[in-house]
C-alpha cells in the first residue's frame, strides 16, 4: 500500500465493538423483494427484504457466514466479513483490513493482531480487495446508516444490482466492489426498485420519497363544555393533538381549547409533549404520524409490546395492528420483531406504547397500572 494513499498511525490496540444495526427497512425500499442484506451485528446474520412487510432476520448455521454478493451462506474462510467481530485481524497476516467503525479507516494486521490503524485521504474509502484506498464517500448516497458506524452503501448492497435512492425518484445506484456508480433515468422517468429499472413517471414507483400528508383529522374533545377546569386529555385520532379545559374569555363557564405538539406526541400520563417513541398515547390515535417513506413500522399501544402498525407516508395502512406473536416483542428502533421478551422491560422504559397503563374511554384520563411500574421511573 502506497504511503501517499494512507496516513498511518501505528499503535497496538484491542478492538471490541458492539455494532449497532442500521435502518434495514429503509434500505429494503430501494431493492427488489427477496434481496438479502447483511446484519452489522454478526457475519452470520442477514435480513430478507419482503414486499410490504418487515424485513425478516435469519442466521447462517455454525461454520458459515453470509455473503451479500452471492446472496447465500458460505463456509467461514471463503468470504471475508468484518462485521461484529472482536478482532478483524483474525487469520490475517501482513494485510490491510477495513475498520468496522467507518469505511475510510483501515487496520494493518501482523500474525493475526492489529499492528496499526489509519485513515484514507478525504474523498476516499478503503477497498479490501484492492488492499488500498479508492475514490468514494462514506454514506455518499444520502442513505445514511443510523447510529454509527458510518459505512459506505456498497458495504450493505450486493454487487452488480441496480437499486434506488431515498431522496430522488429518478436516481439509481450500482455497486462494483466498493466503488459506487450513480445515474439518472432519462426523459424524466423514475427508477422503480420493483423492476430494478426506469419506468414512466406516471407509474407509482416513488412513494418511498413522498412526504407524509397532513390529514388535519381530529376527533375533538371528549365532551361538550362546560368541562372540569384544568383537565388535559389527548385526541383519539391524532397523537399530537390535546385539549385543555380552561376558563372561557367571554363567560364564567369553561371550554376545551385545542393544542398541538410540534413533531411530538401528547403523553397521556405526564400531560406533556414528548418524543414519539417515548410518549404514552391513547390507543387508536395515529402512531404513524411524522413517519416518512412508503414503509415503516411503529409500536402499537400494547403492554406486551408484541403489536405494531405498518406505516405508509405518515398513515397506518390498516386499522388493526399486526403482531410478532406471543412471547416476542416489536423493536421500533431496529424495525423488526425480537425473538423472546427477556429485554422488553428495558425497551419499554424508553418506548411509551409498551408501558402498562389504562385509559377511561369516556373521560380519556389515564393511569399507570401500578405505582411501582418499573417503566415509569424514567419519566
Swiss-Prot record:
Instruction: List, for all copies, the residue spans of the domain called Chitin-binding type-2.
Output: 25-83, 86-143, 151-208, 224-283, 285-356
Question: Tissue specificity, please?
Answer: Larval peritrophic membrane.
Question: Record's Gene3D superfamilies?
Answer: Chitin binding domain (2.170.140.10)
Glycan attachment sites: 150, 168, 247, 252, 341, 356, 373
Q: Which InterPro entries match?
A: Chitin-bd_dom, Chitin-bd_dom_sf
What UniProt keywords apply to this chain's record, in alphabetical order?
Answer: Chitin-binding, Disulfide bond, Glycoprotein, Repeat, Signal
Functionally, this protein is described as follows:
Binds chitin and may bind related oligosaccharide structures.
Q: By what name is this protein known? A: Peritrophin-48
Amino acid at each position: 500500500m502506497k504511503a501517499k494513499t494512507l496516513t498511518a498511525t501505528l499503535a497496538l490496540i484491542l478492538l471490541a465493538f458492539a455494532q449497532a444495526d442500521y435502518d434495514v427497512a429503509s434500505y429494503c425500499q430501494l431493492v427488489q423483494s427477496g434481496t438479502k442484506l447483511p446484519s452489522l451485528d454478526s457475519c452470520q446474520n442477514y435480513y430478507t427484504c419482503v414486499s410490504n412487510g418487515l424485513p425478516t432476520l435469519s442466521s447462517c448455521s455454525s461454520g458459515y457466514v453470509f455473503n451479500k454478493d452471492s446472496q447465500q451462506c458460505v463456509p467461514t474462510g471463503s468470504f471475508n466479513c468484518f462485521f461484529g467481530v472482536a478482532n478483524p485481524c483474525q487469520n490475517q497476516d501482513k494485510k490491510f483490513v477495513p475498520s468496522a467503525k467507518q469505511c475510510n479507516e483501515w487496520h494493518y494486521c501482523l500474525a493475526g493482531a492489529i499492528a496499526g490503524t489509519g485513515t484514507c485521504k478525504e474523498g476516499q474509502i478503503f477497498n479490501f480487495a484492492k488492499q488500498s484506498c479508492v475514490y468514494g464517500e462514506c454514506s455518499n448516497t444520502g442513505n445514511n446508516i443510523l447510529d454509527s458506524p458510518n459505512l459506505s452503501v456498497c458495504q450493505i448492497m450486493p454487487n452488480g444490482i441496480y437499486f434506488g435512492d431515498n431522496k430522488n425518484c429518478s436516481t439509481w445506484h450500482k455497486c462494483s466492489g466498493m466503488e459506487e456508480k450513480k445515474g439518472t433515468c432519462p426523459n424524466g422517468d423514475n427508477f422503480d426498485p420493483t423492476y430494478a429499472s426506469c419506468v414512466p413517471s406516471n407509474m407509482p414507483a416513488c412513494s418511498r420519497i413522498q412526504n407524509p400528508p397532513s390529514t388535519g383529522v381530529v376527533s375533538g374533545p371528549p365532551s361538550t363544555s362546560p368541562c372540569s377546569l384544568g383537565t388535559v386529555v389527548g385526541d383519539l385520532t391524532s397523537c399530537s393533538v390535546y385539549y385543555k379545559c380552561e376558563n372561557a374569555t367571554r363567560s364564567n363557564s369553561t371550554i376545551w381549547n385545542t393544542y398541538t405538539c410540534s413533531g411530538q406526541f401528547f403523553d397521556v400520563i405526564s400531560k406533556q409533549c414528548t418524543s414519539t417513541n417515548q410518549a404514552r398515547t391513547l390507543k387508536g390515535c395515529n402512531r404513524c404520524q411524522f413517519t416518512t417513506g412508503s414503509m415503516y413500522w411503529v409500536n402499537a399501544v400494547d403492554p406486551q409490546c408484541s403489536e405494531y402498525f405498518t406505516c405508509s407516508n405518515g398513515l397506518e395502512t390498516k386499522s388493526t395492528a399486526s403482531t410478532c406473536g406471543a412471547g416476542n416483542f416489536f423493536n421500533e428502533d431496529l424495525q423488526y420483531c425480537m425473538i423472546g421478551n427477556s429485554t422488553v422491560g428495558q425497551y419499554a422504559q424508553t418506548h411509551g406504547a409498551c408501558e402498562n397503563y389504562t385509559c377511561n374511554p369516556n373521560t380519556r384520563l389515564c393511569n399507570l397500572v401500578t405505582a411501582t411500574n418499573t417503566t415509569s421511573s424514567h419519566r
